[in-house]
């Protein structure tokens, strides 16, 4: 059974390498969680090798741009789903030259890709085309369906906020399935917790639906073991017992750590906060205390057992 700890300093001396998630652990997309900046910077000052491991569809160069202004040290390495997907496409210019796309921002990610190094499409010649000309589908966001690089032709969806699959999305998925197109998913997250503890629906939910329909999905990110192993190679790890992964998603972070054979620290106040009746923004003991019975029930349901658990990422 997982051990509940008060803060990272309780166990940090056990490890040399720390892999850490960002959303739900360090920040909510807008502001840092209470104590997170201090904890992160102390961790780096303690001489730990830190690798930010994120399911974002943005490339790794965007991590310090996001975290630095919040006060986090930028003395870390980074691996993102978008970065690994970019490498995958870069190595397959012939078989992955044309795609039909779901995204959050066609203009920024595709039309202006040359000036946006964070885009998965930066430096690539991938064309956005209709389904009958596509070699693959890609879901790197959930707000626009695109069959060309013209912003005026995007088909909007409200899946991010409602989780509802509209007719345009159904056509996108059915069209890919009929043509036996693989779907690339650089962010396997199904849900994410944002500002004001608001949940949004992510591309992983679309990929899961395509899989359930019988389609082929290629995931880039957690919980895929390959994603974690990129980090281990970057850190030149020879002893996995000296590595810990910190994250808030049992299905992605804790499952991925288990798949890879490394220890894990589960942040209860992230995406599972409602299930565990904790509040990472709380100021009193009642709001912050992880209730063992709720935690045990959740872990039993998911068949996962993180090495340690704490409410929020604090020192």
Regions found by a protein language model. Name each.
Residues 1-45, 56, 60-77, 86, ...:
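Asp-based, Mg2+/Mn2+-dependent phosphohydrolase catalytic module
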